UniProtKB/Swiss-Prot annotation:
Subunit structure: Homodimer. The dimer interacts with the DNA mimic protein DMP12. It also interacts with the monomeric form of the DNA mimic protein DMP19 with 1:1 stoichiometry.
Superkingdom of source: Bacteria
Name the UniProt record assigns to this protein: DNA-binding protein HU
GO BP field: chromosome condensation
UniProt-listed SMART domains: BHL
InterPro entries xrefs: Hist_DNA-bd, Histone-like_DNA-bd_CS, IHF-like_DNA-bd_dom_sf
GO MF entries: DNA binding; structural constituent of chromatin
Stated family: Belongs to the bacterial histone-like protein family.
Pfam families: Bac_DNA_binding
Activity control, per UniProt: Activity is regulated by the DNA mimic protein DMP12. Activity is inhibited in the presence of the DNA mimic protein DMP19, which interacts with HU and prevents the binding of HU to DNA.
GO cellular component, as recorded: cytosol
Function: Histone-like DNA-binding protein which is capable of wrapping DNA to stabilize it, and thus to prevent its denaturation under extreme environmental conditions.
Keywords carried by this UniProt record: DNA condensation, DNA-binding
Length: 89
């Protein structure tokens, strides 16, 4: 399912226009992104939790030259599914 299909599904489920569904989806993704940037977690009870994970610095290798290099530590967005979502699958 891509974004436009999700918007259509939201519009049908909530009995609203596609434009309203798109605004709602955009507002939701913006709110989650903003919270994660601030280091917060976003928990939707039953659905799951969005949080920021930390990837440690590690050694890698340049595939072209074989030369070792250091890959910097990074923050990555993560999602942990909630019980209701797991049970639905």
């Amino acid at each position: 399912m891509n974004k436009s299909e999700l918007i259509e599904a939201i519009a049908q489920e909530a009995d609203i226009s596609k434009a309203a569904a798109q605004k709602a989806l955009d507002a939701t993704t913006n709110a989650v992104t903003t919270a994660l940037k601030q280091g917060d977690t976003v928990t939707l009870v039953g659905f799951g939790t969005f949080y920021v994970g930390e990837r440690a610095e590690r050694q890698g290798r340049n595939p072209k030259t074989g030369e070792p290099l250091t890959i910097a530590a990074a923050k990555t967005p993560k999602f942990r599914a909630g019980k209701a979502l797991k049970d639905a699958l």
